[in-house]
Regions:
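Core structural elements
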Residues: 145, 168, 464, 657-670, ...
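Cys/His-coordinated zinc-binding microdomains
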Residues: 196, 469, 485, 528-529, ...
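Acidic, turn-prone loop/beta-hairpin segments
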Residues: 100, 189, 193, 199-207, ...
């Protein structure tokens, strides 16, 4: 306490603890992790909470192909905070981590690992390499999750490559097929030419691309309804004007689509007539830089042009004019280039016209075929330029516009994709869409906009393409009749495939011929034949992870269906949230979750996306090395994770300072509990001072606020409540005010302060335990214990509000006392500036009060009031005087305290030297020393 050594230093009760000021988390945390592992902490916790109500947070499986990043850390820590808090709240909350292990990224990694041999290895060999790769990364990622403090059954995670998982997935497929939700058909799907496979909507990302859109004219060849003659327009000089943005699809053009509700005009340019939507004439002419034109006659309904014919712009074929509601007046010409093989709207409208063929002049790799004529062999992106050049030279192009638009890219290789009609397996969403809407309404969405977002996505989506033309995945369990090609899926075949996969895994599909798998006696329902071939496609990985409600929740005895919560990033509305919802509603008739909680993306300190190329990323391993995992956990808790979360070295540096204040609050209390035995030293409530009761009331408010925050998963609210309590209520006030009786006395007053601090620290440590899992355990290890307290703080129950609650009158009284204290501090600062005093204990304060303020202050013993102000003397005077203050009826005056300074407590007192053996001590300190 003193700068110079005093003979009485040894008589002071100065704080003493081995709990270090410097956290040293990077070194301490691994030691704790080893202890948790050695003592099987997770299973102990589950056993400890056995018989309590369950809370099931179902883990969305991360993809097992790399190190974790800050987004993964955010996700896992949010889940861990929830799991720890629920276990402390009175639930048994198991956590079974999962891993998504099939799919293209792992397959591509496996292929690159074998180099030139990839053409020679069998599918079975490739799958074995993929499995090895996935398994290695499961181990790596599990260790990284555990290093973050995540608690769970990492010894028994669920893996989508496990035989029992694959078997259950086959059964879900079978249940959906039995209800008529699974079919195979020709439809345009997202297709990645580089990965040579179909993609689901959830596997698409959008990026801004440049393209040249052109206005192209197609010559009218037939007018079966006599429309042109009716209006006096010569057919040999008449054209439809279209506006394709993907020139490479022109070889697939089989129709031009108009809207039957719109009006169309004949626009004369020179001696030729061009048909386009009346409302778009000016914009088309402006885009084509055509000034001299004439609109001939009155507008004509689009419906009149139906089934006219036109010549393809360069191929020797005719197309049809058809009608569709998807045609709008937002842009273009109102005459839409229609290639049923390369667009969903195009395909759907062509289905209404049997005479319009579906042409797909593009192969798996994105190369034009002989159907494209002279452009055969060109990749679609290159063909854009050559086709444009040729059409321009031929005079077919009326105008060209350079535009930027959002274009779909493959989320695996990040290259542009195409729409391409191929034979694929689909899940028919339309057949149970209404049931999905009803299921969405039963779910609690957090934030609540999730309800409308999911509803909109389900409403707008097409049928789900669930097949992929790759090797590493769960095979589509379908057989084909060798004689007629009809596909064959029955209860018996599903049961046989599921049993085989449960026994040997899905590799068995590649080990055995169809006849060795399909049950005996199965015959083709179309032709009666009984010779079979196996389907060669695998399932979309979103069907894998979307089956976890059955393969995990139903199968694991410690879990149950439906889960209480799914919690992932916002991108999973089109991913796991949705695929799980669809398969669950389709197979079980209800949602797989009671609530859905979502978080945002992690961005850099400026709010920009993190990219390695930009050098603005930060890795969890870096932060752990510099600060420890608890600082990452504090970052998660301090953030509003419902929006994008900023991360960067400056942010973590600031958080380490906030962490230090919380830690030092605990350290100060631990230091003052040295020698305190809560089993024998705690005093009764009636022995507490008023300020102790205030501190406990502040603790009760903290419990109320943090419990409310945890209840709605608002950890930001918890963090701010804890931080403000530690800094404002404790460090800046209560702990400061109580130093004198802690350091300088040994009686009931000191034990009252210790009792209060002990109760505060026990509750505070439990409150921070879900967030600062390492630091809270370190505090717990140093804390004196009462009987019945557990070795691990996570085994404790969260503190309940109400035990230390104060009435409104008490709170109002102390709010006014603190306001008086603040006014005294202002006057002391002024006295210090005027060199009247140095430390506040050199001051004597006179408080001039009206009756109300006098009664308030006089209700506190004068020595306690002096301690509250941290001065040596306080005098109350009724009446006006001193410096005016913000407290009505209060004036404050400060003077240097009279008497001498006590060598032990530093207070000024007239009683110095009253004890002959201690001439430099005040009477109080002398009696303590002599005791």
């Amino acid at each position: 306490m003193a700068k110079n050594k005093s003979q009485y230093d040894s008589t002071l009760n100065l704080p003493k603890t081995l709990f270090e000021m410097r956290a040293g988390l990077p070194k301490k945390e691994p030691v704790m992790l080893k202890d948790w592992d050695d003592n099987d902490l997770y299973n102990q916790l589950m056993k400890h909470n056995e018989g309590k109500p369950q809370f099931i947070l179902h883990d969305g499986p991360p993809y097992a192909n790399g190190n974790i990043h800050m987004g993964t850390a955010l996700n896992k820590i949010i889940k861990d905070i929830i799991i720890r808090e629920k276990n402390m709240e009175g639930y048994q909350a198991p956590y079974v981590p999962g891993f998504d292990t099939h799919g293209l990224p792992i397959e591509l990694k496996a292929l690159s690992s074998v180099g030139d041999k990839k053409k020679d290895i069998s599918k079975l060999e490739l799958r074995q390499i993929c499995e090895k790769f996935a398994t290695e990364h499961i181990d790596i990622m599990s260790d990284q999750f555990k290093r973050l403090g995540v608690i769970g059954d990492f010894e028994h995670p669920y893996l989508t490559l496990k035989p029992e998982f694959e078997a259950r997935q086959i059964e879900i497929f079978g249940e959906m097929a039995k209800k008529g939700y699974i079919y195979k058909g020709l439809k345009p799907v997202y297709w990645c030419p580089d990965c040579r496979t179909a993609l689901a909507e959830a596997e698409i990302e959008y990026g801004e691309d440049d393209c040249d859109s052109i206005f192209v004219r197609f010559h009218v060849s037939q007018d079966p309804n006599g429309v042109l003659a009716k209006y006096g327009i010569p057919m040999d000089k008449t054209y439809f004007v279209i506006w394709p943005t993907t020139t490479w699809t022109l070889p697939a053009n089989e129709a031009i689509c108009l809207n039957g509700q719109f009006e169309y005009s004949f626009v004369k340019i020179g001696e030729e007539y061009h048909i386009m939507a009346t409302d778009l004439v000016k914009s088309v002419m402006d885009a084509c830089h055509i000034e001299n034109y004439e609109i001939v006659g009155e507008p004509v309904s689009g419906a009149e042009f139906e089934l006219m014919r036109y010549n393809h712009v360069y191929l020797p074929k005719e197309g049809w004019v058809i009608l569709g509601d998807h045609v709008t007046l937002e842009s273009g010409s109102g005459c839409v280039h229609t290639a049923g093989g390369h667009g969903v709207d195009d395909f759907n409208v062509c289905q209404k016209y049997p005479q319009v063929p579906i042409t797909v002049p593009v192969d798996d790799g994105g190369y034009l075929t002989e159907l494209a004529g002279k452009y055969a062999g060109q990749r679609v992106w290159a063909a854009n330029k050559t086709i444009l050049a040729d059409l321009t030279a031929s005079g077919a192009v009326m105008g060209q516009v350079h535009i930027k638009h959002q274009y779909p890219h493959c989320w695996r290789c990040h290259n542009p994709i195409i729409f391409r009609a191929t034979e694929q397996w689909f899940c028919s969403i339309a057949k149970f869409r209404e049931d999905v809407y009803k299921a969405i309404d039963t779910v609690t969405w957090m934030p609540d906009w999730g309800h409308d977002r999911m509803t909109g996505m389900v409403r707008d989506r097409n049928d789900w393409c669930i097949s992929r033309q790759r090797t590493w995945g769960v095979p589509i369990p379908a057989f084909y009749c060798k004689k007629c090609g009809t596909y064959h899926i029955t209860d018996a075949t599903i049961k046989a495939v599921s049993a085989l996969f449960r026994k040997e895994g899905s590799d068995a599909w590649y080990k055995y011929d169809a006849e060795q798998i399909i049950p005996a006696g199965e015959v083709c329902e179309k032709c009666g034949a009984s010779e079979w071939e196996k389907d060669t496609d695998i399932m979309d990985v979103w069907f894998d992870s979307g089956s976890t409600h059955a393969a995990v929740l139903d199968e694991r005895p410690e879990l149950r269906f439906p889960a209480d919560m799914y919690m992932e990033g916002g991108d999973q509305f089109r991913g796991w949230f949705q695929s799980s919802l669809l398969t669950s509603v389709a197979s079980k008739g209800c949602a797989p979750y009671k609530s859905v909680l979502c978080h945002g993306w992690v961005v850099d300190e400026q709010g920009k996306q993190m990219h390695k190329s930009a050098g603005n990323g930060v890795e969890p391993s870096e932060i752990i090395k510099d600060y420890g995992a608890d600082i990452i956990r504090l970052w998660v808790a301090s953030s509003d994770y419902t929006v994008d979360v900023r991360a960067g070295k400056n942010i973590f540096k600031q958080l380490s300072e906030a962490y230090r204040k919380i830690r030092n609050t605990a350290r100060f209390i631990l230091g003052n509990l040295d020698g305190f035995d809560p089993n024998t030293d705690c005093v009764a409530d009636d022995q507490l001072q008023d300020i102790d009761r205030w501190a406990l009331a502040a603790l009760d408010d903290l419990i109320v606020n943090t419990n409310a925050g945890y209840a709605v998963y608002d950890f930001n609210k918890v963090y701010h409540a804890v931080y403000n309590f530690c800094v404002v209520a404790m460090s800046n006030f209560y702990l400061d005010v109580t130093k004198d009786r802690l350091y300088c006395t040994n009686g009931a007053a000191r034990k009252a302060a210790q009792t209060t601090m002990y109760k505060i620290l026990v509750a505070l440590d439990k409150i921070i335990a879900p967030i600062l899992c390492f630091t809270s355990q370190e505090i717990w290890d140093f804390m004196p214990k009462t009987e019945g307290m557990n070795k691990y703080v996570v085994f404790e129950q969260m503190p309940k509000a109400g035990q230390y609650a104060a009435d409104d009158a008490f709170k109002a009284k102390w709010a006014q006392l603190i306001a008086v204290r603040d006014e005294v501090k202002k006057v002391l600062e002024q006295a210090r500036a005027e060199k009247l005093i140095g430390a506040s204990l050199e001051a004597s304060v006179t408080l001039y009060c009206n009756d109300a303020v006098y009664d308030l202050l006089n209700s506190i013993p004068m020595d306690e009031l002096a301690d509250l102000m941290i001065v040596s003397h306080v005098e109350l005077v009724k009446g006006e005087g001193g410096a005016a203050s913000a407290v009505e009826g209060l004036g404050v005056a400060a003077a240097h305290a009279t008497g001498d300074k006590c060598e032990r407590c530093w207070k000024y007192s007239a009683s110095i030297g009253s004890h002959p053996a201690h001439p430099t001590l005040c009477a109080r300190c002398a009696s303590v020393v002599e005791a």
